[in-house]
From Swiss-Prot:
Residues spanning the membrane: 9-29, 49-69, 103-123, 137-157, 165-185, 213-233, 247-267, 276-296, 337-357, 363-383, 396-416, 419-439
Protein purpose: Responsible for the low-affinity transport of potassium into the cell. Likely operates as a K(+):H(+) symporter.
Organism: Shigella boydii serotype 18 (strain CDC 3083-94 / BS512)
Membrane-topology annotation of the record: Multi-pass membrane protein
S-S bridge residues: none
Signal peptide interval: none
GO molecular function: potassium ion transmembrane transporter activity; symporter activity
Localisation: Cell inner membrane
Protein name: Low affinity potassium transport system protein Kup
Gene name tied to this protein: kup
A single Gene Ontology CC term: plasma membrane
Similarity annotation: Belongs to the HAK/KUP transporter (TC 2.A.72) family.
Record keyword Membrane present: yes
Length: 622
């Protein structure tokens, strides 16, 4: 989205507030409460309050303002961001071994996101609904059911798209941030002493005074920056400048005022630690605050769900996940998609998490490991891009990496303390996703290599067919080919069993480029291989969905006319059997067979009319 038009800049910035900052913007609901709840062995003491506030503020400055907004967002692929984009950029100018390591890092980062995304909707909505405990303590037993009801409605509306609802996101989130600022400023005015915590020496003093406990407490401080990856991942939707402008003009001031306002309240009334956010508000404002907090957390959850859809589509297009049904919910915006399988799997996981953990404080113990792990990987990948792609001085890049890791590694290490109390959850989910992605990619490669290892030359076969043609039948046949120089299995089996060939034969290859979009001018490449054979290569970006009808429309514009309803599409359908393998590779093979059986069929994947498809089966041992 361009920001060149100055008149549109305020609207784009407002939209960025509504989508990008939902997660990090709802962190004040629970962050300071978890920091000072007594779990680390100290209560609401002046030095502890000042120390935590100083840590939170300077984390927002260093991690969000400097690392992500200033440095990481420089690394874009045609304006797009995200951990898989960073992985792709980092591996462009490196050796094969280094590229493999970077790919593994990127996949781990993507897997971590899947692990955390189960927790974000649960902890966000529950922390808002828990405001009921302040309004009416007798309703505390309704927190879990109400949280499930709210999230059920949210997941149910996904299939209708969020375009209409999304128009409300920005004004609601802007109102939310203004409320954060207003509540915090009101409390700070009553106790301005709290502003001393802006001095970073209070963070240093905190470590010196509380020693080992202060290090472990970093696991709670990191809650203030959860959602920071969204800034980079959503860069393609809004552009760098609007995201930066929204942060420095609205989000950062509002968060700072609210955190320090909560600190001022706790210095004055330590008993407010049971829920310092809601106790900032006067009694008459509690119910309206509860309502807008619930709306803000729903918006934060929506942003995460949309992020999962986008990451899944990117992983599918790059070949790391099996093809699945992707529905476009907007004719105008290609980024608005709905993936039913992912939506309902995520819903089931979120409900299980809510029922199992019962309170947002329990979920806070599960939060942070995957976030900080992704931060470490982002530091390594982004500095690799700076060195290999931007050709920055290696010593300067090394200093940047050391500075980032000096913050990231302590945060990650501190969160490892949460492993047994809930941190195992995102790690387990992330591990499962990593195994699934690497299994699909490696076994798919093994299958393709197995299918084509004994293949003949395509050029030689075409020359032979033109010289001694079989029976020719009227019409056009399209054979889907995974590689441009390989004879499609369906073509070989059609000749073997039916012993006929159509008057025109098109070998069609759909490939994904290392870019989010491919310009229509470069969409289709046509090459005539002989009098009756053509090769068509259609290129798509990883944010685009291939459409065969569109491909042949482009072919018609370039002189190769082809009517969809008068064309036969031949595809091979592999029946896979496992060969002899070690037990661990056999398990991986069985997982691949399960994924293959449930993958979206090629005709549905490429939107080919079912009555024009002929599938020819073949058995392959892998």
């Amino acid at each position: 989205m361009s920001t060149d038009n100055k008149q549109s800049l305020p609207a784009i910035t407002l939209a960025a507030i509504g989508v990008v900052y939902g997660d990090i913007g709802t962190s004040p609901l629970y962050t300071l409460r978890e920091c000072l709840s007594g779990q680390f062995g100290f209560g609401v003491e002046r030095d502890a309050v000042f120390g935590f506030l100083s840590l939170i503020f300077w984390l927002l400055i260093f991690v969000v303002s400097i690392k992500y907004l200033t440095f990481v967002m420089r690394a874009d692929n045609a304006g797009e961001g995200g951990i898989l984009t960073l992985m792709s950029l980092a591996g462009r100018n490196t050796s094969a071994r280094t590229t493999s390591m970077l790919v593994i890092m990127g996949l781990i980062g993507g897997s971590f996101f899947y692990g955390e995304v189960v927790i974000t909707p649960a902890i966000s909505v529950m922390s808002a609904i828990e405001g009921l405990e302040i309004v009416a303590p007798q309703l505390d037993t309704w927190i879990v059911p109400l949280s499930i009801i709210v999230l059920t409605l949210l997941f149910m509306i996904q299939k209708h798209g969020t375009a209409m609802v999304g128009k409300l996101f920005a004004p609601i989130m802007l109102t939310w941030f203004l409320i954060l600022a207003g509540l915090g400023l009101r409390s700070i005015i009553a106790n301005p002493e709290v502003l001393h915590a802006l001095n970073p020496m209070w963070a240093v003093h905190f470590f010196l005074e509380y020693k080992t406990v202060s290090f472990i407490a970093l696991g709670a401080v990191v809650l203030s920056i959860t959602g920071v990856e969204a800034l980079y991942a959503d860069m393609g939707h809004f552009g760098k400048f609007p995201i930066r402008l929204a942060w420095f003009t609205v989000v950062l001031p509002s968060l700072t005022l609210n955190y320090f306002g909560q600190g001022a309240l706790l210095l004055k009334n330590p008993e407010a630690i049971k829920n310092p956010f809601f106790l900032l508000a006067p009694d008459w404002a509690l119910i309206p605050l509860l309502i807008i907090a619930a709306l803000a957390t729903v918006i934060a959850s929506q942003a995460v769900i949309s992020g999962v859809f986008s990451l899944t589509r990117q992983a599918v297009r790059l070949g790391y996940l099996s093809p699945m049904r992707i529905i476009h919910t907007s004719e105008m915006e290609s980024g608005q998609i709905y993936i039913p399988f992912v939506n309902w799997m995520l819903y089931v996981a979120v409900v299980i998490v809510i029922v199992s953990f019962e309170h947002s404080s329990n979920l806070a113990a599960a939060y942070g490991i995957a976030v900080t792990g992704t931060m470490v990987l982002t530091s390594i990948l982004s500095t690799t891009v700076a060195r290999q792609n931007w050709h920055w001085n290696k010593y300067f890049v090394a200093l940047i990496l050391i500075a980032f890791l000096c913050v990231d590694i302590p945060l990650f290490t501190a969160n490892l303390d949460k492993l047994l109390s809930g941190g195992w959850l995102p790690l387990s989910l992330g591990t499962v996703m990593f195994i699934v992605m690497t299994t699909w990619k490696s076994e798919r490669f093994r299958l393709l290599r197995r299918m084509h290892e004994h293949g003949n030359s395509l050029e030689a076969m075409i020359a032979s067919l033109e010289k001694s043609p079989p029976v020719r039948v009227p019409g056009t046949a399209v054979y889907m080919s995974r590689a441009i120089n390989v004879i499609p299995f369906a073509l070989m089996h059609n000749l073997k069993h039916n012993k006929v060939l159509h008057e025109r034969v098109i070998l069609l290859t759909l490939r994904t480029e290392d870019a989010p979009y491919v310009h229509n001018v470069r969409r289709v490449q046509i090459e005539q291989l002989s009098l009756t054979f053509w090769r068509v290569v259609a290129s798509y970006g990883w944010r685009e969905t291939p459409n065969v009808e569109e491909v042949f429309h482009r072919c018609g514009l370039e002189g190769l006319s082809c009517r969809m309803m008068e064309t036969s599409f031949f595809m091979s359908h592999e029946s896979l059997i496992l060969g002899k393998r070690p037990w661990y590779l056999r398990l991986r093979g069985k997982l691949y067979l399960l994924l293959q059986r449930n993958a979206l069929r090629a005709p549905d994947q490429f939107e080919i009319p079912p009555n024009r498809v002929i599938e020819l089966g073949t058995q392959v041992e892998i």
